[in-house]
Amino acid sequence: MKKQDISVKTVVAIGIGAAVFVILGRFVVIPTGFPNTNIETSYAFLALISAIFGPFAGLMTGLVGHAIKDFTTYGSAWWSWVICSGIIGCLYGWIGLKLNLSSGRFSRKSMIYFNIGQIIANIICWALIAPTLDILIYNEPANKVYTQGVISAVLNIISVGIIGTILLKAYASSQIKKGSLRKE
């Protein structure tokens, strides 16, 4: 089996992606009124980075970005949700493997595929895994954390569905379409 190294491009993408994730997570959020639950723009950006650079970059961007955001905001990380940010980044990257954004195409079919995938991924991560980890790690009350999880899942589905789709479409549109250049 051939060993695959992580490219410099991927490492740089993780670093820049994590930094942007922190900035968006700290300064571009809309409070919902429910404790520790906001409309997050950072996950739409995470979907873009993950779709472009793949599951590993998504995993690391989500983990590092969320951990730094928590440390700079609260003084410590809420590890159950940090882990889920990594998982969701990996899932966005896995979904992105089928999109082929570098071809310059992000069709209606691709948008539907992306959005069905991100809806399923967000429900699994935020409505199921994060609250369960909150109970196992922090002994949090189930009704509180599952309510937070469901609200977060719905808000992330909306944010990624709108902002993420726009970002992916804009990125694909900036790529040179295959076969668009002809020799004269």
From Swiss-Prot:
Record keyword Phosphoprotein present: no
Sorted alphabetically, the keyword list is: Cell membrane, Membrane, Transmembrane, Transmembrane helix
Q: Name the residues that span the membrane.
A: 11-31, 44-64, 77-97, 111-131, 148-168
- Could you say which protein family the record assigns here? Belongs to the UPF0397 family.
Report the leader peptide range. none
A single GO CC term for this protein reads: plasma membrane
Q: Which PANTHER family match?
A: UPF0397 PROTEIN BC_2624-RELATED, UPF0397 PROTEIN SPR0429
* Native source organism of the sequence: Staphylococcus aureus (strain MSSA476)
What this protein is called in its record is: UPF0397 protein SAS2570
The yes or no answer to whether the keyword Transmembrane helix is present is yes
InterPro entries (UniProt xref): ECF_substrate-spec-like, UPF0397
Q: Name one Pfam family in it.
A: ECF-ribofla_trS
Stated membrane topology is: Multi-pass membrane protein
What is its subcellular localisation? Cell membrane
